[in-house]
Amino acid sequence: MSNVLTGTYAIDPAHSNVEFAVKHMMITTVKGRFGDVKGTITIPEKGEPTADVTIATASIDTRTEARDTHLRSADFFDVEKFPQIRFVSTKADRTDDGWKLLGNLTIKETTRPVTLTVTEEGAGVDPWGNQKVAFSAIGKFNRTDFGLTWNAALEAGGVLVGEEVKLSIDAQLVKQAAAQDKVAA
């Protein structure tokens, strides 16, 4: 994207969303989000962009407190013992409108490769003079690969919670000062 400037950008949590969707009872989809997301994306003059993102597991929100409490428990994320999810990119392949971003996703100390399809949404300067870039991304993974194995069998067959997790990310990032770019490199 010709509008995207090189440098290191930090996620703007007020203008970014990390959402997920999982089948419930094999017939409906439950959606949720994580409210506490931090990280950086570095866009070099040449070569591949890199990403390093952390998500606070306790910030999970499905709009149902009882379900959120269960998701924070040892049955799922065990937020007391494993307070963060982390994604670190390992490779980026250019596509027509963005990137295939390959990386390592770590949940509960289990790391597995995940691929995100990233679309460049635009770049600009906000009213306060901050350089911004925006990306959207989608991906999926099997939750049981990360030790998120709790489930309950249904009388008619099947299970309560689906294994496939679909991710949807909308991120706005703000360019960091040049001195910070050098420190991050």
Give residue spans per PLM region.
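Low-complexity, acidic/polar, glycine-enriched regions of mature
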Residues: M1-A185
